[in-house]
């Protein structure tokens, strides 16, 4: 039997899907990302959303101002697609190096997505230009039809929206974000070099039983929602396969405690502080620690056409216990795995 490593040295990772919010929340959560990640794709679903080059530049400056001294962190900005968005704004932002990608939220699919796209046909001109200039499209892949069960919305999206979109724009670089189903995993793994996906820590570690059995656990509630264990296992097998078009995207999405623990709680898991420990734990359980660095640090830059980070981090096989709460002024955040321990810590 091969001895398991006690220290893993990997290239500094990037987070290819994160919500940093703004103001006090931004200042509170950013250090948990900037300490260990070199770059992050920052979601644009603020209120109001980031739809112009000017608003993206201003938001990037607010993020950089909140980076703790000594952290080398670079936010990668995205543009929020709307039915009425001017295609020239997208092209200009990408060519200036302000926008790294554009984000497609189906209208009302998730938090702050009411301004989202009502039909792909409404943005076909934008997608055509994005394909031409090589700008990636990031997709929250769920249909919003009320007649479709919440557990089926990702698979239905692939069938009715994503596949036709990719047929129409075959050379458009597409990232199907935070995939949660065996259908999505199979679709991406069997796809071509223009299709990639991110996977979150919570969808690899947990399934819907963890959220619903023995009481409702609101801090595991996110969108897309946790699925049954067969889907969780399919995701785990996909990352263990070493597919080069799967990469780290935490979808870390903080909400104040009272907005999660309510009669109508918000969707989102704040996992930045536990993400790397969680990924290492899952990859070890799948006997795939040799695939961890590529998933965390190499596959994303390759797909985006960016260099890998030139610094390194180390994961140690030692117990780390995560905080029960994180102070947020007069409020607090309940982080992923609050009060729980894992056997991989990060330095």
From Swiss-Prot:
Needed co-factor(s): Zn(2+)
Q: Check the record and name the Pfam families matching this protein.
A: Amidohydro_1
Q: Residue positions of the PTM N6-carboxylysine?
A: 103
Q: Does the keyword Metal-binding apply?
A: yes
Q: Which residues form the active site?
A: 251
> Which residues take part in binding Zn(2+) 1?
17, 19, 103, 251
| Record-annotated disulphide pairs | none
Output the CDD domains linked to this UniProt entry.
DHOase
Q: Which SUPFAM superfamilies does the UniProt record give? A: Metallo-dependent hydrolases
According to the record, how does the cofactor bind? Binds 2 Zn(2+) ions per subunit.
Q: Which GO terms describe its cellular component?
A: cytosol
Q: A GO molecular-function term, please?
A: zinc ion binding
One Gene Ontology BP term is: 'de novo' UMP biosynthetic process
Identify the residues that bind substrate: 19-21, 45, 140, 223, 255, 267
Reactions catalysed, semicolon-separated, are: (S)-dihydroorotate + H2O = N-carbamoyl-L-aspartate + H(+)
Binding positions for Zn(2+) 2 per the UniProt entry: 103, 140, 178
Please state which protein family the record places this protein in. Answer: Belongs to the metallo-dependent hydrolases superfamily. DHOase family. Class II DHOase subfamily.
What is this protein's function per UniProt? Catalyzes the reversible cyclization of carbamoyl aspartate to dihydroorotate.
Assembly description: Homodimer.
What name does this protein carry?
A: Dihydroorotase
- Please give the organism: Pectobacterium carotovorum subsp. carotovorum (strain PC1)
What's the source species' lineage? Bacteria, Pseudomonadati, Pseudomonadota, Gammaproteobacteria, Enterobacterales
């Amino acid at each position: 039997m091969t001895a398991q490593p006690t220290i893993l040295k990997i290239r500094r990772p990037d987070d290819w899907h994160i919500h940093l919010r703004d103001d006090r929340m931004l200042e509170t959560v950013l250090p948990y990302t900037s300490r260990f990640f070199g770059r992050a794709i920052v979601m644009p679903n603020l209120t109001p959303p980031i739809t112009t080059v000017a608003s993206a530049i201003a938001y990037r400056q607010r993020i950089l101002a909140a980076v703790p001294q000594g952290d080398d962190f670079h936010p990668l900005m995205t543009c929020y697609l709307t039915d009425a968005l001017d295609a020239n704004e997208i092209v200009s932002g990408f060519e200036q190096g302000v926008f790294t990608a554009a984000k497609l939220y189906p209208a009302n699919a998730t938090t702050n997505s009411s301004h989202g796209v009502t039909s792909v046909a409404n943005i076909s001109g934008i997608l055509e230009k994005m394909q031409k200039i090589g700008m990636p499209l990031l997709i929250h892949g769920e249909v919003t039809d009320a007649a479709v069960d919440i557990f089926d919305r990702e698979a239905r999206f692939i069938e009715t929206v994503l596949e036709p979109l990719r047929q129409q724009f075959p050379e458009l670089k597409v990232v199907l974000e935070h995939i949660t189903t065996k259908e999505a995993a199979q679709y991406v793994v069997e796809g071509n070099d223009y299709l990639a996906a991110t996977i979150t820590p919570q969808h690899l570690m947990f399934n819907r039983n963890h959220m619903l059995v023995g009481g409702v656990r609101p801090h595991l509630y996110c969108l897309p929602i946790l699925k049954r264990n067969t889907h969780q296992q399919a995701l785990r097998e996909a990352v263990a396969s070493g597919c080069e078009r799967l990469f780290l995207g935490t979808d870390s999405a903080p909400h104040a405690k009272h907005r999660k623990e309510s009669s109508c709680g918000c969707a989102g898991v704040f996992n930045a502080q536990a993400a790397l420990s969680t990924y290492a734990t899952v990859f070890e359980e799948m006997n795939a620690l040799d695939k961890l660095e590529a998933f965390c640090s190499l596959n994303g830059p390759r797909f985006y056409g960016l260099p890998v980070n030139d610094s390194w981090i180390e994961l140690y096989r030692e117990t780390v216990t995560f905080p029960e709460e994180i102070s947020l002024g007069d409020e607090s955040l309940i982080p992923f795995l609050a009060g729980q321990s894992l056997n991989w810590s990060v330095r």
